[in-house]
A protein has these predicted regions:
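C-terminal amphipathic alpha-helix
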Residues: 28, 32, 89-130
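Intrinsic disorder/low-complexity segments enriched in polar/small residues
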Residues: 45, 52-53, 71, 82, ...
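Classic N-terminal secretory signal peptides
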Residues: 1-12
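Immediate post-signal-peptide N-terminus of mature secreted/exported proteins
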Residues: 10-59
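Short, flexible helical or helix-coil boundary motifs
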Residues: 24, 28, 52, 62, ...
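Extended alpha-helical coiled-coil "stalk/arm" regions
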Residues: 47-83
């Protein structure tokens, strides 16, 4: 649910910026473009940390699965295998969520870059269209 609220707010922010760029509204456009570099850097750092955590979870998972395969009795293995299946699904869900966030970030970057180029090409005089 939180992701949907975040996506809706991000979409609304891009729509508002697009309208400001169309009006050559420097007061609204410039702060958004100026903050973009920091926002992108933070996204990259957060994505790296999440991917690092996913990789660590996968390595731990693989080690435990290997140990179970090598040492488990048939009855115990069944219960432990079920836990591993659920944990594997959780890790894959995290990876899919991160991949979706990266995809959306790429689309957002493309939109921001296109709006910035439009603004620079059409609003270079320093006068706002009102």
């Amino acid at each position: 649910m939180m992701l949907l609220l975040f996506l809706a707010s991000s979409s609304a922010e891009l729509d508002a910026l697009d309208q400001a760029v169309a009006r050559c509204d420097r007061a609204a456009s410039t702060p958004a473009f100026a903050a973009e570099s920091e926002r992108r850097s933070q996204f990259q750092l957060d994505s790296y940390k999440e991917q690092e955590a996913i990789v660590a979870a996968r390595l731990d998972f693989a080690q435990r699965r290997r140990e179970l395969r090598e040492a488990a009795t048939p009855r115990k293995a069944s219960a432990d295998e079920q836990k591993l299946v659920l944990e594997d699904a959780l890790i894959e869900d995290r990876q899919r969520a991160l991949n979706d966030q990266r995809m959306l970030e790429g689309l957002r970057r493309d939109a921001m870059d296109a709006m910035r180029r439009h603004f620079l090409a059409h609003c270079a005089t320093g006068k706002d269209k009102k």
